[in-house]
Structures are given as C-alpha cells and as structure tokens.
Design a protein with these regions (language model features):
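Phosphate/dinucleotide-binding and metal-coordinating scaffold of catalytic cores
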Residues: 1-193
C-alpha cells in the first residue's frame, strides 16, 4: 500500500470512518477501509479506534466504541473526564456525539495544537528517556522530580490520587505528558488524557 498523507476528517465523514473501523476490528475489512483509516488516523496510537476531525475550526480526536466492549468504555471515559474536571484536574474539552447509526463516539479537543499548529509534546516516558520494555525504574516520583513547576507536581499528585480512587488500571508514563510553553520557554504538564 502506498504512503498516504494524513488529513483531518469532518463530522459528516464520521459514519463512514466508524464503519471502516468496525470492519477492521472484526477482521472483515478490505484495502479501502485501511486507506480511509490511514488517511484520517494514521499517527494516532492507542488501543481504541480513533480519527482526527475538524469541528468548528478546531481539531478533535474522535474515539469509537468497539464491538467487543463489555461496557460503554466511551461513556465511562467521558464520565471520568468530567469528574477529573470537577476535581480541579486540567482536562481537554470533550463531548459525546451520536452517529447516524445510533452509536456513541467521544470527541476530545486536541490540546497539542493551536490553530492547527503543533505544540512540542513529549510523553513522560520519553521525557525520562525510558525504552518501551525497559527494566529501568520508572514512577510518578521520577517524573515528578523532573518537573520544574510546583503546580505541575501538585497536579500530578492529584491525578495519581484520582486514578487510584477511580481504579484506573491504565495509568502509566505514556498517559502523562509535557507540552512546551513557548511564551515561558518551559516544558509544562499537559492536560490529563486517556
């Protein structure tokens, strides 16, 4: 398959993207499904099917429900984003949408873009220079020690506490990150995600 340049979808294209993503999940896809998903979600990692869309001139990630979900992971993630916000943790703007087929999808505003320009972004694992399956020590403590701003350290602690209270078992150093603040010329803790 030839290399395709990524592009952003629109809300009008979400139903077709959802159908392609489901065919891939169910191993019933053809090359056209792969091409469509590669164009709109090629660089987006993670376990959940997702694409990037433009909504009101802003970029959003859209996460789809998966056919084998035991419960509504999308609704649960939206609930946790809302609870984290109420707890004073910085999270990106998010909203649930309903596709034409009745399926729910979660839209999350991209915090690593300003007017579609990329902001420098590093996961905590990359920041600490850890390899994927490294036996090196990695922890909240080592990440917190590397943060310059006390407010970032406090927020990291609040996230740790929040994740423990919510029984978040997917809490690791790839789910925390830093964004480069060009105004203050410093790396700062990104909003919470995933």
């Amino acid at each position: 398959m030839e290399k395709i340049s990524p592009q952003n979808a629109t809300l009008a294209e979400l139903d077709a993207l959802f159908e392609s993503a489901m065919r891939v999940e169910l191993d019933e896809y053809d090359e056209s499904d792969l091409v469509l998903l590669q164009v709109c979600g090629a660089a987006l990692g993670g376990a959940r099917a997702k694409v990037c869309v433009v909504y009101q001139n802003e970029l959003y990630l859209v996460k789809f429900a998966l056919p084998n979900d035991d419960f509504s992971v999308i609704l649960w993630e939206k609930t946790l984003l809302d609870l984290a916000h109420l707890a004073g943790i910085r999270v990106p703007e998010s909203r649930l949408i309903t596709l034409k087929n009745g399926q729910k999808a979660l839209m999350i505003k991209r915090f690593d873009r300003i007017n579609s320009a990329r902001l420098p972004f590093l996961s905590a694992r990359s920041w600490l220079n850890l390899q994927a399956n490294s036996a090196q020590e990695s922890s909240y403590t080592s990440f917190a020690d590397s943060l310059c701003e006390t407010s970032d350290k406090i927020e990291l602690f609040c996230r740790m506490y929040f994740n423990a209270l919510c029984a978040n078992t997917d809490d690791h150093l790839k789910n925390h990150a830093l964004l480069y603040d060009r105004t203050n010329k410093a790396w700062r803790l990104s909003p919470a995600y995933d």
